[in-house]
A protein has these predicted regions:
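Carbohydrate-binding/catalytic loop surfaces
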Residues: 243-247, 264-267, 307-319, 346-359, ...
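Extended ligand-binding groove/face enriched in aromatic
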Residues: 292-401, 405
Length: 557
């Protein structure tokens, strides 16, 4: 055999092509050398209510080529009815967790901070998060050695006992050890076994494990981590919305869309559910200093993100009967002026950034809805169709000088097109062009949606982290499109997948998983890959998740 690490990707591609009904080729991370970490993913691994247990095979943490060769041997035997796990177990694999092999990644878990920009060991962060949210029934680590040995983590001790081959516990702070106790990433533990074996003993040892799992259904129960994820998925759209609305939308300093979307979401939720106390009076108190002028609403430099901080104006007027709040939207829309020589309308960035597609779409569209004046739509349609940053794939560059497929940048484009279509009359000039751009983008994003339902931080970089805000924005845009008849029923499955991924990444306290931090235009691909991912409270992500939940309720109830 050639170096088992060198041609691994081609080997996995071949296996995925040969067994298309079983596997898909994916990626679970990016190395410090900017190589994707390939993963062979069983197509049932993310399926709700699957009748099979899920096992994840991992190897190569130390960088050892012998370990990777052992994992390849295990995978090659899997399709065989005699040696494979059979129909009761879906098997996914990360055969080489450490493709660069620059450092030994065997210990040092859980990784603390630096998601996913750690300069020395980003692989640990990627592996940790990806495995936690795959949440298999069992993790099986393979290591090459001269003698057979089985070890387990705390959660896998019952499996080790049933095998009657226990060699004790794996070492502290190893990946298996840290995943096997407590509440990794706010979920639950995942049982883990480590098999150390010479190649000639591998098939027999694996056969014992597969036979045991086949004969004892109790050992195939969902891991505690998976149980937490499924419980999150089982919540209704309004349940998730109420959780998010209990946390987000209580600040307006600074005046920015990251605050405004949450405030808007709280008002929308009350109108949809009519449960509890209306948030209107509290929001009136929150915004009054700005509305009255006692507190300056904006600083010296005012961009679209600041103007969209007032996105709640029409909803608050509807809730209170006070027209001042709708008037705020009209006032900020009047700040948009025609561009010069085909340029973007100030205060939009002259480079046609996708952020402005959402900000302008939201505020100019609402201004038209309030006043009926088509001059707002003229500005909006000219801007949306004049940027020329949508590519043949349907995806958008971040802006004209930044030819990078940033995930939230495409989310902003999706939201901008969606908001624009929401307000454009059916016969309005340019509507067909906007609708075609919208459908082309939806097609492009759905094609690259991860099996988890998520979009990656950099859309054309397999293994970049699964980013929550962009996935919420995609889901919102699809749900609105299905509800309004802009999209056909084939989009329901990608929408359901997006909701599943998002709902699993919002806990019962409204904490979120991996929302990209505030990001301006970056100069290099690496800078987009290295944008920090927020885990916990994040008003930007929480507000978008709230809007997504509300649109899902409107669409599906």
């Amino acid at each position: 055999m050639t170096n088992p690490k060198a041609d691994l990707l081609a080997h996995l591609e071949s296996m995925a092509a040969r067994y298309q009904d079983r596997w898909t080729l994916s990626a679970c991370g990016v190395t410090v050398g900017r190589r994707s970490i390939p993963a062979l993913l069983d197509k049932n691994s993310n399926s709700p209510g699957a009748n099979t247990a899920s096992a994840l095979l991992i190897s190569g943490l130390s960088g050892s080529a012998d370990d990777v060769a052992l994992a390849r041997r295990a995978l090659d035997s899997t399709p065989s009815d005699d040696a494979g796990p059979g129909n009761h177990i879906s098997l996914s694999a990360i055969p080489d967790c450490n493709p660069d092999g620059l450092r030994d990644l065997s210990t040092g878990y859980p990784p603390i901070g630096g998601f996913f920009y750690n300069a020395e060991e980003p692989e640990k962060r990627y592996l940790w998060r990806w495995i936690c949210f795959l949440a298999p029934t069992l993790i099986l680590e393979l290591r090459s050695g001269e003698a057979v040995s089985w070890q387990s983590n705390e959660a896998g001790s019952n499996l080790a006992s049933a095998l009657a081959r226990s060699g004790g516990r794996v070492e502290n702070e190893s990946l298996l050890d840290s995943l096997g106790s407590g509440s990794p990433d706010g979920l639950g533990p995942i049982p883990g076994l480590r098999l150390t074996s010479p190649p000639e003993s591998l098939d027999d040892e694996l056969g014992k494990l597969w036979k045991l799992l086949s004969e004892q259904p109790g050992l195939r129960e969902a891991s505690p981590a998976r149980q937490v994820l499924e419980a999150r998925s089982a919540r209704s759209h309004l349940e998730v919305a109420h959780i998010l609305a209990s946390v987000y939308g209580y600040q307006l300093d600074p005046v920015n869309y990251t605050q405004g979307v949450g405030i808007s979401g709280r008002l929308q939720l009350y109108e949809l559910s009519k449960t509890g106390e209306s948030p209107a009076s509290g929001i009136v108190d929150l915004v009054e200093p700005y509305v009255s002028g006692s507190t300056p609403m904006f600083g010296e430099r005012v961009g679209g993100a600041n103007l969209a901080g007032l996105i709640w104006g029409r909803e608050l007027s509807a809730a209170t009967g006070d027209p001042r709040y709708s008037d705020l939207i009209v006032a900020v829309a009047n700040r948009y002026q025609p561009g010069v020589d085909g340029g973007a309308p100030p205060p939009c960035d002259p480079d046609f950034r996708t952020e402005d597609m959402f900000m302008a779409g939201a505020m100019l569209g609402r201004a038209f809805g309030i006043t009926g004046e088509t001059r707002y739509l003229d500005l909006l349609v000219g801007f949306i169709t004049g940027g020329n940053i949508q590519q043949e794939s349907g995806l958008f560059w971040h802006c004209r000088p930044a030819n990078f497929y940033w995930s939230r940048g495409n989310g902003f484009a999706a939201m901008g097109l969606t908001e624009t279509l929401t307000y454009l009359p059916e016969n309005y000039p340019g509507r067909d062009t906007v609708a075609a751009m919208y459908r082309k983008l939806m097609d492009g994003l759905v094609k690259i949606q991860d099996p988890s339902g998520m979009l990656s931080q950099v859309l054309d970089m397999p293994g970049s982290y699964q980013e929550l805000t962009a996935t919420c924005m995609l889901g919102y845009s699809i749900a609105r499109g299905l509800r309004r008849g802009w999209l056909g029923p084939s989009y329901q499955a990608p929408l359901d997948l997006a909701w599943r991924g998002v709902s699993q990444r919002v806990d019962d306290e409204g904490n979120v998983v991996d929302g990209c931090a505030s990001t301006g235009v970056q100069a290099t691909l690496n800078e987009y890959l290295d944008r920090p991912a927020v885990f916990g409270f994040d008003d930007r992500t929480g507000g978008m998740a709230l809007w997504f939940a509300l649109e899902m309720h409107r669409h599906q109830g």
